[in-house]
Amino acid sequence: QRHFSDIPNKKLEMPVYSDSLFSNKEVPKFHHVESVRDRDVLKISFDMPDDMPFWESKPTQFLAHLLGEEGEGSLLSYLKGKGWSLGLETSTWWRMFHIKVQLTDLGKEEYEDVIRACFSYIQLLKEEGLKNYIFEERKKLADIELKYIEPKSSMGRASQYSASMLYFPVESFLSHYYLYHKHSQEDFEKFLSQLHVENMQVS
């Protein structure tokens, strides 16, 4: 406020983008790209609603955590057990959610089975929901991470934080940005419901 209070607030309305990224039926579901690296990656991408208004429950972060787990019973452990995958990661950016699977030679041949396995695991999440103990674990870890937050470039942090301040209360910005404030099964299911075949692209 000390540095920016002289800038007039024009109270402009935020633009709303309601069209689905993958709603056009003429857009191919599958894209094959020759890799310049010595590895093959299967990427399943989903169009998602804007998750910033859901900062209290952070549903996309739980989706990324649950689908990206590496322990026993995880999606990755199943794919590795089949000899299809060397690694898996999830990511979110704006209105996109990605599942990236690093394929073995066998996984490349049987990529359709890899996709089916991903959707089987998504169905399992729909049946089980977001369990309270998982929320509490992530909540405690976030508390610790904020307490011992690693320094990063001032420019990068300023850009990241200033954009997020459109959604978070300025007075308690950091806690709202990093921490989990409520366990919402409804929010989790809202975003989980977007992970379906009609709403995906594969590359």
Regions found by a protein language model. Name each.
Residues 1-203:
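Mature, solvent-exposed C-terminal subdomains and processed small-chain segments of exported/organellar
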